[in-house]
Amino acid sequence: MGACGSKGSTSDKGLASDKDGKKAKDRKEAWERIRQAIPREKTAEAKQRRIELFKKFDKNETGKLCYDEVHSGCLEVLKLDEFTPRVRDITKRAFDKARALGSKLENKGSEDFVEFLEFRLMLCYIYDFFELTVMFDEIDASGNMLVDEEELKRAVPKLEAWGAKVEDPAALFKELDKNGTGSVTFDEFAAWASAVKLDADGDPDNVPESA
């Protein structure tokens, strides 16, 4: 996994307490479907799926995707909104990161669009941000997009199941709460989770490369 987020500004509720009407079983089934829906693998079959998926996203047939096309494709083609109400936030993070990195690759790519060269990269980031969102929402019991110290302490078994070693929950909270506000944002959690390589699904990603 490799993703870092910006400050969570969305007001959408988290998934942890089923405030969006989904139960744990529903989320697990949706998560498995999304794993199958996003062709991230470096295989000929997955690449062919990406070619077909790119064409479905590229409604204007320009050979490049603007953000609105990416967001629309994630809703209409991949149906990622079945998983979380925060699709726009997740896809925007992934789109921005992929196009920024893609524009630096051999001076190719566009600053405003994602081309096929960056498409797999973007899909990997979408998957990463979904995984980070799953973990954060499981910890954020209140659904307010902030994790307090008590929520973190209660989540220690989950953190350890995802691969973290937590010997001192209080010390970990101080480490995560970089600005000392008394709560941990999605951005702070995502940076730490990526650094320690937390894995919610047991399927570690390869380092994203070109299409």
From Swiss-Prot:
Chain positions covered by the region annotation Disordered: 1-29
Effect the entry attributes to changing residue 23 to N: In strain: Miranda, PBOL and DM28C
Residues covered by the EF-hand domain: 45-80, 81-116, 127-162, 164-199
InterPro entries in the record: Calflagin-bd, EF-hand-dom_pair, EF_Hand_1_Ca_BS, EF_hand_dom, FCABP_EF-hand
Subcellular localization: Cell projection, Cilium, Flagellum
Residues annotated for Ca(2+) 2 binding in this entry: 140, 142, 144, 151
Result, substituting residue 210 to K: In strain: Miranda
Keyword Repeat appears in the UniProt entry: yes
Gene3D superfamilies reported for this sequence: EF-hand
Basic and acidic residues bias (residue ranges): 15-29
Entry GO CC: motile cilium
Protein's UniProt keywords contain Nuclease: no
Residues holding Ca(2+) 3: 177, 179, 181, 183, 188
Keywords, comma-separated and alphabetical: Calcium, Cell projection, Cilium, Flagellum, Metal-binding, Repeat
Protein name as annotated: Flagellar calcium-binding protein
